Amino acid sequence: MSNTVVTGEVLDKSIREVVRILEDAVGCTAGPKGLTVAISKPYGSPEITKDGYKVMKSIKPEEPLAAAIASIITQSASQCNDKVGDGTTTCSILTAKVIEEVSKAKAAGSDIVSIKNGILKAKEAVLTALMSMRREVEEDEIAQVATLSANGDKNIGSKIAQCVKEVGKDGVITVEESKGFKDLEVEKTDGMQFDRGYLSPYFVTNAEKMLVEFENPYIFLTEKKINLVQSILPILENVARSGRPLLIIAEDVEGEALSTLVLNKLRGGLQVAAVKAPGFGDRRKDMLGDIAVIVGAKYVVNDELAVKMEDIALSDLGTAKSVRITKDATTIIGSVDSSSESIASRTNQIKAQIENSSSDYDKEKLRERLAKLSGGVAVLKVGGSSEVEVKERKDRVEDALHATRAAVEEGVVPGGGAALLYALSSLDGLKGKNDDEQWGIDIIRRAACAPIKRIIKNSGSEEAPCVIQHLLKQNDKELIYNVDTMNYANAFTSGVMDPLKVVRIAFDLAVSLAAVFMTLNAVVVDVPSKNDAAGAGAGGMGGMGGMGGF
């Protein structure tokens, strides 16, 4: 394997081509009238989706230079997805436009550093303007925000609003596939979520979404650190014989114990995952007790308990209908053995502690525990007549749920690309130090119009320039263009709102990514040599040598 260095016009041309391909594929999904994309799979039928992030991840050019450029862009999109769970499509549209405009500046021989300074100066002004437009989302507007993010599906919007009403704005809402034919159902169940993720990515069962997903697992709870596997070996053996997964919640799992669990998982043995217990000190002890009540565990093993880890039987462990673990959080859904009486008793105990406490801090922490214990979990069950239909609908439900959470967290701004358009007024008095810096400011002025133009284009209309001109003339920052009705309306009365957090992060990341490409002078890429190609072709089973490793 040799490599080559790509620079100059060849590099710039490749960047433009890759960005255009990504924008064409991802941008077509924008807006309520956006189109779907089919993604082929190694096995089975193609997946149909309107999820911009999923489309972007699936694009893997064969040519090494194009693949390297696409990888850089996808990493940025993944940051958008990780931070807010939505906005990838907007991010890709903005990135493509900024890079297109920067390419023109480069071709004209402009100073790239000055242009970059102008772009970053304009970015800060636009972000400040976006913040000034925000307003808190009202409870009756939650359905509208979710509907817009679900590409106009009012059923999804109303069901998400129902979930928020049942478990509260800070409650736990999850999405899972249903075996039934109903499009979408809401099920409220006992459960809890806490801010601790898996201790090793090797525990992941869903590699595409980097999740651990267990059905009907056993749950072992301890306040102690687990360093040696010997102490939990009887538990592991008993659970392995049952054929069910195991979740370990402990102060920590490290050293030999963690490496043994990972090795066992990689070899296809026991389905197991470990997470750290939430909280610290006495609060950790209390929260483990809360979890034990929810999952029906008889013991939380600690130094004060007469029962040792080695003596724990299957009947002493907790159970749940399902468990979902990300790198940051663990969600336990639907206890199996826990009774409503035990949860009621525990909540009454916490309420009494709140009444008797004189510390505001302690009261706040007790209220947090009470909310987690009594709030439960709302499960959005997605069904359909085919696997393709279910997966496409599930993508939209997840996007809508992320958008709803973002709206609750930071508020909303006028939707349909209008917020970025109106934020451009902040650039009117902004002047660059020189012509090239001013060019950078003007690049942001043109790029910020790209999302609304794309949304209008996806609706089948070619009237974007006229629409933009009309919106800016009215001097009303709540006015939007509704592509569903092909008419102008008030953003908040018509329900065409975007979560500020989604717009803000998508814009910020897009400009930052474009700035990276602006100063990119060379890319070193691997090029397969003739000897590599000959070696790969010798012997049809030659590729099996890697089976011995991980």
From Swiss-Prot:
GO cellular component, one term: cytoplasm
Annotated Pfam families: Cpn60_TCP1 (PF00118)
InterPro entries found in the cross-reference section: Chaperonin_Cpn60_CS, Cpn60/GroEL, Cpn60/GroEL/TCP-1, GroEL-like_apical_dom_sf, GROEL-like_equatorial_sf, TCP-1-like_intermed_sf
UniProt record, GO biological process: protein refolding
Stored NCBIfam families: GroEL, PRK00013.1, PRK12849.1, PRK12850.1, PRK12851.1
Superkingdom of source: Bacteria
Taxonomic source organism: Anaplasma phagocytophilum (strain HZ)
Role according to the record: Together with its co-chaperonin GroES, plays an essential role in assisting protein folding. The GroEL-GroES system forms a nano-cage that allows encapsulation of the non-native substrate proteins and provides a physical environment optimized to promote and accelerate protein folding.
Oligomer and partners: Forms a cylinder of 14 subunits composed of two heptameric rings stacked back-to-back. Interacts with the co-chaperonin GroES.
Ligand binding (ATP): 29-32, 50, 86-90, 416, 498
CDD domains linked to this entry: GroEL
Signal peptide, first to last residue: none
E.C. no: 5.6.1.7
Family: Belongs to the chaperonin (HSP60) family.
Reactions listed under catalytic activity: ATP + H2O + a folded polypeptide = ADP + phosphate + an unfolded polypeptide
Keyword Signal: no
Protein name: Chaperonin GroEL
Gene Ontology MF term list: ATP binding; ATP-dependent protein folding chaperone; isomerase activity; unfolded protein binding
Record's keyword terms, sorted: ATP-binding, Chaperone, Cytoplasm, Isomerase, Nucleotide-binding
Localisation per UniProt entry: Cytoplasm
Enzyme type, top EC level: isomerase
